[in-house]
Each structure stands twice: as structure tokens, then as C-alpha cells.
Amino acid sequence: MIRTDAKDGALVLFSGGQDSATCVAWALERYQTVETLGFDYGQRHRVELECREGVREALKHRFPAWSDRLGDDHMIDLSVLGAISDTAMTRTIEIETTANGLPNTFVPGRNLMFMTIAAAIAYRRGLRVLVGGMCETDFSGYPDCRDDTMKALQVALNLGMDTRMVLETPLMWLDKAQTWQLAEQLGGEALVELIRVETHTCYVGERAELHDWGFGCGECPACKLRKRGYEAYLKGERVTEAPL
């Protein structure tokens, strides 16, 4: 397909979770065109993908100013990533810390593949900005979520595609309480409530019970951090250490 001229638009990595939903709202406040991109890689918590359309529709209907800006959604089958991964995100195994100090929820190469595919789609669609919810403040230590990684990837992608794309990571230095706060700043209590009810974070895919902070098992690291972040947000506090 012929490449279109670069426009005031962004492509957001959107999993259906809290962080990426916040990033979609962040982009909608800044760019005239916002498209979304999801990946089905055989994740254990595949229910998050089922939340994506509900979040998109809610954003359109509850925030009229954003409705015309929210463009196409793209879903990519990346089952090969799940096939080559042996992690707690792609296998039904206990979540634990590995010998290298990383949790076994780390999927090697995941964000590198996500951003590379996103860049190829953005190139074709004429979108200049890629947006991801990576951050260094969630205590996971994932190397492909680090600021240095994203900066290096931006350089590599632009060299390899002869473009001037920008990789934006608006949550990079925000803790989970500040992520809730950002949602409030972007869309008020209505956006906070949308994210609380419509998004999914739980690693094990539990979506049977709605807690104060959202759906989830309440026991996995993702649920504990989301819960702690929501509680800290309500109290005006920060999340300075990993919840137990």
C-alpha cells in the first residue's frame, strides 16, 4: 500500500488494560486522529482483549469531544510470541521471581515486537506518533519497559524506516496512583469510573467480581498494584514500594 503523508495522528498500543486505556485518553486530548492497536499473543489474561471494544465505545459516547478523533482499531494475531514464550503470562503456571530477579510474567521481546509492528502500521497509515503505556515505576523491572529501551528503539525504527516517528510513553515516570490521577485530569471522574469498571489488569484473567478498584483476582501482582494505586489515589498519596 502507498504510504500516506504524515498527519497529526497517533497509534496507541491498547491492550484493554488500565494503563493503555489512560494512554488512549491522553492521545485523544493531543492529536486529531487516534488509532488503536491490540495484540493477541495467547496471553493468559486474554479477557483484556474482550474489554477493548467496550472501552472504545464508552470513550466515544461519554466524551463527545473525543468521538470524532478516535479512529480505526487494529488487531494483530501474534500467536508466534506465545508459542516461543514460557512465562506466567502465556502458560498456566505460578507467578514467581526467577533467578535473574525478574518476575516470570516478563515476556522477552514483547514490547520490542509490539512497537516494531506498530511502527510498520503507522508508516502505512501516515501516523507520526506511537504511544505506549510502558513505565519504570511499577516495580516489575521489565527491561523492555525502560526509558532507555524506548529511546533506543525510536532511533532504530527511524533509521530502519527512514522516518521521524516519535515514541511517547506518558506513564514512564508515574506511579500507579499518579496514573489514576492522570485519568482524572484528562476526563474527570467519568474517565476514572470508565477505567475502573471497563478495563482489565488481572494477570490470571479473573473478571467475576468487581472490587472498589476494578475487576480481578486481588492476589496477583497486577491486581495488588492496581488496588494499592487506587487507594493511594483516593488518599492523595504516592505508591513508593511494591504492595505485598
From Swiss-Prot:
GO MF annotations, alphabetized: ATP binding; ligase activity, forming carbon-nitrogen bonds; zinc ion binding
Q: In which pathway does it act?
A: Purine metabolism; 7-cyano-7-deazaguanine biosynthesis
- Cited Gene3D superfamilies: HUPs
- Enzymatic class: ligase
EC number, as in UniProt: 6.3.4.20
Q: Where on this chain does ATP bind?
A: F14, S15, G16, G17, Q18, D19, S20, A21, T22, C23, V24
**Which reactions is this enzyme annotated as catalysing?**
7-carboxy-7-deazaguanine + NH4(+) + ATP = 7-cyano-7-deazaguanine + ADP + phosphate + H2O + H(+)
Q: In the UniProt record, does the keyword Nucleus occur?
A: no
- Asked if Oxidoreductase is a keyword of the record, the answer is no
Indicate the family of this protein. Belongs to the QueC family.
Instruction: Provide the protein name.
Output: 7-cyano-7-deazaguanine synthase
Q: Which organism is it from?
A: Burkholderia cenocepacia (strain HI2424)
